[in-house]
Swiss-Prot record:
Recorded name of the encoding gene: thrS
Domain of life, source organism: Bacteria
One Gene Ontology molecular-function label: metal ion binding
Protein name, entry field: Threonine--tRNA ligase
Region of interest (Catalytic), residue spans: 246-537
UniProt family annotation: Belongs to the class-II aminoacyl-tRNA synthetase family.
Signal keyword on record: no
UniProt subcellular location: Cytoplasm
NCBIfam families linked to this entry: thrS
Listed PROSITE patterns: AA_TRNA_LIGASE_II (PS50862), TGS (PS51880)
Subunit-level organization: Homodimer.
Keywords: Aminoacyl-tRNA synthetase, ATP-binding, Cytoplasm, Ligase, Metal-binding, Nucleotide-binding, Protein biosynthesis, RNA-binding, tRNA-binding, Zinc
Its EC number(s): 6.1.1.3
A GO CC term assigned to this protein in UniProt: cytoplasm
Length: 639
């Protein structure tokens, strides 16, 4: 008998020869139709068909867990591979990984050996995939010596698989299959093809074998897979909506920002985009002031010695930009925290001063490969709304709790009401003592639990210096965006020898808390553009009011209205062009102005305004003071 310990600490006995599926069906029957794989001792993920061979802590993985989701998508990649080789007998498979960012959740790179594949071929491939699903093949696994595997794939002419096997250090490799078809793979996979009911091929592109332009050009087919048609349909709806809302398209239409060939990956903010950027910064700056934060600024270029001391030189080197000053190595900062710690260290500190909260809108630079750049979502220069808090250890939980409240206050201000929260735990490559990591992780959990906030666990996805809370916001079309973080850091205070004098006169190390709410202003603005479809709420809108004249006779009256509104603090544009009013209205609608003031002789004579609100066809007549009062009330009501 073996013993398996569940997450609730209950222990279950398992008979010899039982598979993990047998165990789930007996002990956890409510999960038998959702289970995709199991995770043992927090790291070893195995198929449900594997025989239990040891005592272990066990987690059942479903589609809602990341590892379960990855198992599902990777199995769908195998489904695609089998369908392609059933239809195209000469096709050679290479690799079929799971991805998080791209036009699909998985892809397979395939050498069709001269056959041209286009999206028009997708229906035929999808039909074969559906046939395989309906056949409900059992997914089998076999472990064989490398020599045998090479001989097997040589007979099939699978030259890429032979090359992959040659790079594997182990003397054995695993093969997964359905029916007579099989593929080289580490796994894990779902138990049978019938589980993969809902899928869609989404895109096609070219890709060089091993990303080397001197190698063969392959065909990369992307796809997505879901447990149900409802979830697939929802995803496809999101994709179509996302195309309409693409922040790159809307940003160009509203003249918010651009990217230039002289600086790929570096956004250029135009006047209206700068208004939006400043609105976000000003709001958060005011909220920080209410909560006792002190704003600082640190240099963009700092000595390599600093980055070696902070650990970034070893852990972040490939993402940094370097320069030489006076024959010494320097780097553009990829993060703000080391500079902030130098400011803390510049003075002596007493326990009476702590917690000490520093805030910085810090511009950072990180090298990203050209192929992963994506509008404002993935750039090489961005501004973080960083805060670094230095506190005694006993203040950690209260500070984290306050930051949680602060974070949700900000998100709700922008109209976000649904969230998912995760705790990311210690990665393999990390720094610090085991007891500090355990204490910090437990404190983050307790802080969320006391606020009644449910959370998931992202095993091994914390920063190298400490665990973190990740805040995900759901936008207006149901997509989740990871934005804010709260990170606990015991490493940097130790590395920089930061201390304070406690009440007993002894020097002690503070704990350091890294906090960001937007994450980066650039990315958060991209999210807002797509969330609102460019129709920003009045308080941050760069196009609040457009004044349109019907005839030239009212130009002076329109200018007088313009000046009054500008003096009241609003962003106003005046259109006195000698154009038909219909054309002016259409142009203003495209600019997504919150309000149009359509002024003719009637309004001039009565001293009133004809007001049309964005999204409405009718106009209302208001006094000038009444309109200003309404605008002020609308901004106040935004929270």
């Amino acid at each position: 008998m073996y013993q398996l310990t569940l997450p609730d600490k209950s222990v279950k006995k398992v008979a010899l020869g039982s598979t993990y599926r047998d165990f789930i069906e007996k002990e956890l029957p409510f999960l038998k139709n959702k289970a995709l794989a199991v995770r043992l001792n927090g790291k070893d993920i195995q198929d449900l068909s594997r025989v239990v061979e040891t005592d272990a802590n066990i987690e059942v993985l479903t589609y809602t867990e990341k590892a379960g989701w990855e198992t599902f998508q990777h199995s769908a990649a195998h489904l695609l591979g089998m369908a392609v080789q059933n239809l195209y007998k000469n096709a050679n498979l290479t690799v079929g990984p799971v991805i998080e960012n791209g036009p699909g959740f998985f892809y397979y790179d395939i050498d069709f050996q001269g056959t041209i594949i286009t999206p028009e071929d997708f229906p035929k491939i999808e039909a074969e995939m559906e046939r395989i699903v309906k056949a409900d093949y059992t997914v089998w696994r076999k472990v064989v010596p490398k020599k045998e595997a090479i001989e097997t794939f040589q007979k099939l002419g699978e030259k890429y698989k032979i090359e992959i096997i040659g790079g594997i250090l182990s003397e054995e490799v695993s093969i997964y299959g359905m029916g007579e078809w099989f593929d080289l793979c580490r796994g894990p996979h779902v138990s049978n093809s019938g589980i993969l009911k809902s899928f869609k091929l989404t895109a096609i592109s070219g890709a060089y074998w091993k990303a080397d332009k001197d190698n063969a050009m392959l065909t990369r087919i992307y796809g997505v897979a879901f447990p149900s048609k409802k979830e697939l349909d929802q995803y496809l709806f999101q994709i179509e909506e996302a195309k309409k809302r693409d922040h790159r398209k809307i940003g160009k239409e509203l003249d918010l920002f651009s990217f230039q060939k002289e600086g790929p990956g570096f956004p250029f903010w135009h006047p209206k985009g700068t208004i939006l950027w400043n609105s976000l910064a000003d709001y958060l700056r005011a909220e920080c002031n209410k909560r006792g934060y002190q704003e600082i600024k640190t240099p963009a270029v700092l000595s390599s010695e600093l980055w070696k001391k902070s650990g970034h030189w070893d852990n972040f080197h490939e993402n940094m930009y370097f320069t030489d000053i006076d024959e010494e190595d320097y780097a553009l900062k990829p993060m703000n925290c080391p500079g902030c710690s130098l400011i803390y260290k510049h003075h002596l500190h007493s326990y009476r001063e702590l917690p000490l909260r520093f805030a910085e809108f810090g511009s950072v630079h990180r090298h990203e490969l050209h192929g992963v750049l994506h509008g404002l979502f993935r750039v090489r220069a961005f501004t973080q709304d960083d805060s670094h808090i230095y506190a005694p250890l006993e203040h950690l939980e209260s500070e984290v709790t306050d930051i949680i409240d602060f974070t949700f206050t900000v998100y709700k201000k922008f109209g976000f009401s649904e969230f998912k929260t995760f705790i990311a735990t210690r990665p393999e490559k990390s720094q610090g003592r085991d007891e500090d990591w355990e204490f910090a992780t437990n404190t983050l959990k307790q802080s969320l639990e006391k606020k009644g906030i449910p959370y998931g666990i992202k095993e091994g996805e914390g920063a190298f210096y400490g665990p973190k809370i990740e805040f995900n916001i759901k936008d207006s079309i149901g997509r989740l965006w990871q934005c804010g973080t709260i990170q606990v850091d015991f490493s940097m205070p130790e590395r920089f020898e930061l201390d304070y004098t406690d009440s007993d006169g002894q020097k002690k190390r503070p704990v350091m808390i890294h906090r960001a709410i937007y994450g980066s202003l650039e990315r958060f603005i991209g999210i807002l553009i797509e969330h609102y479809e460019g129709k920003f709420p009045l308080w941050i809108s760069p196009n609040q009011i457009r004044i349109l004249t019907i005839t030239e006779k009212v130009a002076e009256y329109a200018k007088d209205v313009y000046c009054e509104l500008v003096d009241a603090g609003f962003r106003v544009e005046l259109d006195t062009r000698n154009e038909k009013i219909g054309a002016k209205i259409r142009d203003s609608i495209l600019k997504k102005a919150n309000y149009l003031l359509i002024l003719g002789e009637k309004e001039m004579e009565s001293g009133t305004l004809a007001v049309r609100k964005r999204g409405q066809e009718d106009t209302k007549t208001l006094t000038r003071s009444g309109f200003i009062s309404n605008l002020q009330d609308e901004i106040k009501s935004a929270g």
